[in-house]
Amino acid sequence: MEKAYKLLGKHRHYDWGGKTFLPNLMGVENVNHLPYAEYWMGAHASASSTIYTSEGEKDLAALIKDNPAQWLGKDIATKFNGLPYLYKILDVRDVLSIQVHPSIENAVIGFKAEEVKGIAINAANRNYKDENHKPEVMVALSDFWLLHGFLPPAILEERLNNYSYLKPLVDEFKGADYQNLYAYFMQLPTEATDEILKPLLEEAAKAVAKGTLTKNDPHWWAHKYYVDGIPAKNIDKG
């Protein structure tokens, strides 16, 4: 059996992606001016790579499923029963919304529950696309700004108290309850979050216009997300 194989990955055309970097990298002509956000190489069920073998082109996920020990080795096949990582190349043109990754235990439970409910894997209300918890390692090929985690309790509480439109959230953070604060905000009706976020975005826009913000300030990124104007309603909670 050959030791190395050529792989052809799959492009993901998410709205936030750029239109030139990945097509140029992969030698693809973007005739339809689509956003090329991600290039996946792996055996994910929704975008498995094509592998070139002596017997022709094959689906990588199908090969692994049919004979995991042959393609992954006995140890990896026994421990993970599948390829345990997904390699991605990203071209992030627009600001991404918030992401929350579950623990491995919750991922397994959540995936099985949504399978039982019959929620389509590509449905908008589908939370668990697979049983993985998705720890990530990122290598930046250019400057990349990332907001990761939460502020320390004292600083976050001070921040909430410093802005009148954020004060309604203070009570939800009693005892440094990050989980309660996050769950409360994300489950608020859209109209309620619009009332909180609109003044934040208006303040950010004024500060940017005055030149008083830098990329180290979260307000700068809030403004960048809606750089073309603040929507009248349905402001993104993330």
Predicted regions and their residues:
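Acidic, glycine-rich loop-and-beta core segments that form the ion-binding/anion-interacting portion
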Residues: 208-238
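Transition-metal
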Residues: 1-216
